[in-house]
Amino acid sequence: MHAKKLDKIATAVLYSIAGIIVAILASLILYILVRGLPHISWSFLTGKSSSYQAGGGIGIQLYNSFFLLVITLIISVPLSMGAGIFLAEYAKKGPVTNFVRTCIEILSSLPSVVVGLFGYLIFVVQFEYGFSIISGALALTVFNLPQMTRNVEDSLKHVHHTQREAGLALGISRWETVVHVVIPEALSGIVTGVVLASGRIFGEAAALIYTAGQSAPALDWSNWNILSVTSPISIFRQAETLAVHIWKVNSEGTIPDGTIVSAGSAAVLLIFILIFNFGARKLGSYLHKKLTAA
């Protein structure tokens, strides 16, 4: 009886803690949405931002956030796939491999502001990229690469060893087994990790303040010269993202309706991050059922 009572008490305590955490998160989400949703309109989502006048929008910042996300994923996904495949399939157990994994763990725990300062010193100053999308994308790659590499490695390791043995038994090479057997089996976990990392990238601010810049120059949508700083597809122009815009509006306080702009921007940012998170789980579940014919 005593053991059963302790079990019930422990269960009640755990449920209470979980309930408190969920309540805090739900309250925070509702607070941001209730404050921001009334100020969101089509003109707000597509309009140009204003530095000193009321009525500005977030169109360029929203586009910059997505464009920077795409460039970051183009760089980080192949790198994380290569590193994850090596660690899961080819790396032998030993001090060198353990050291690499320790470095990955350390890098994944670095504060984003430290990564931003590193990006500023290396990409902005040393490589002379200046405040630009490519500097921000490289900094975010450094920031997210450890987590994405670990996700790929874990996803590949969760594939049962019999799958590998079956591929090798058919006479195909180890690399072909990885490409045609292991990766398709682990694809749902890999894609889920990439989408979750996308949400993290989309909402990042500290690392981009020092690398991508804090201004959003007007874009010429008829200019498709990748080297032009007014081109929407240029990676060498400054690009204030939505998260940086929220920080800037709240810190500078030069916009008369800064509170409204900040609340609306925060709601938009939160909505997209929620879409990334819930979408990752739905997409991962769909791919798992599709690939395993469950």
Question: Where are the regions a protein language model picked out?
Answer:
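Interhelical loop and adjacent transmembrane-helix boundary motif
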Residues: Y52, L208-L269
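Transmembrane alpha-helical segments of polytopic membrane transport and secretion proteins
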Residues: M1-I20, R281-A294
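Periplasmic/extracellular loop-to-transmembrane helix junction in inner-membrane transport proteins
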Residues: M1-V13, I32-I74, K93, K248-T259
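Transmembrane alpha-helices
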Residues: R174-Q214
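Generic hydrophobic transmembrane alpha-helix motif, especially the helices
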Residues: E105-T141
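Hydrophobic alpha-helical transmembrane segments of multipass integral membrane proteins
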Residues: Y63, F67-I75, L79, A83, ...
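Transmembrane-helix boundary motif in ABC transporter permease subunits
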Residues: T72-I104, A280-K289
